[in-house]
Every structure is written in structure tokens, then in C-alpha cells.
Amino acid sequence: VIMCADKPGEILEHNDILLNLNPPCRIKDTSWIKPGKVMREVTLTTEGGKALVDFAVKRNLQYIHFDAGWYGFEYDKASDATTVTLDPRRNPKIDALNLKEVVAYAKQHGIGVMLYVNQRALQQQLDEILPLYKSWGISGIKFGFVQVGSQVWTKWMHEAVKKCADYGLMVDIHDEYRPTGFSRTY
């Protein structure tokens, strides 16, 4: 598809072309998809998570997000995104985060919880973490440091997003993902 215009602004006026070249939404029940504002929790502690939930309620935010470090050092192949194992560089208190307690607290206050997971863990554990995160009450996953642009990685990304949709988990892509219109379908 080639888009042409007399003025650059006219391209933006017709930026729905790529979106509309994709099939319509294939998700039968989209009620779980709730766009909103999210704020990152940086202390990786139960207290910090609850405090951020309270902040989110007061500021009309819809989600909190636990970033890198909640399942270990994200660049270590041994890090396991099925466990809450804090990266000691981020928080030396190994048992400082009771994620299930924070998720329950957030749910009581109408706030969703999202988790950061980098591509290394996503590639190795995606099929394992999706049902687990669903059972934990997680609202979505922030894909981190994913490869973007090539056909191979775009296909991988689309398949991963489809799998997340099967479990009712929203996806936030951390990196410079190039829109392909796939968001119309999933």
C-alpha cells in the first residue's frame, strides 16, 4: 500500500487505510478489553503496589504495572516469569512483593494489574504463563524488548497477541512496534 497526498497532514487524515485492510475483529467477546491509563510500580513491594493502587484510584488511572525485576533479572536465562522472584538489584528483600495480595487489593478498588515480561521469557514461557496470569487475575502483559520490523518477528508478535487474546489478557508493546493494522483483528 502506498499512501500519497498533496500535504503531509492529508496522510494522517487517511491513516485508517492500513487498519481497514485487515480482517475485522476475531475476538467474540471484547468486554475484557478496557483501554486506560497505567502507572509503573517501581519499588517491587506489596506496600508500594497497594500505595500505587490508592494513587490510581484518586487519579482516575485504570491500571498499575509491575516492571522488570519482579521475576528476576530480566537478562538472565534462568529468570522464571512463572514466579515472583525479585531481582536483588531492584529490591534486595526477596519476599517484599506478594503479587497475589496486590492483585486482590487492586481488584477490590477497580484497578487492573499488568506485568512486564521481556521477549526472552515470552519466547520460552508464553504458553505456560498465559493460563497462570489469567488465574492470578492479571489484566495484561507488557511485552518488553521485543524484536520489531522483520516479517519473522512481526509474525511472532501477531501469534503471541492472538494467544494472549485467547486468555483475555491485554497486550502493551514496550518497543517501537510498527502498526500493521493488526489491532483491528486482535
Predicted regions and their residues:
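Conserved structural scaffold segments of CAZyme catalytic domains across common CAZy folds
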Residues: 1-108
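Aromatic- and carboxylate-enriched substrate-binding clefts and catalytic-loop regions
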Residues: 68-186
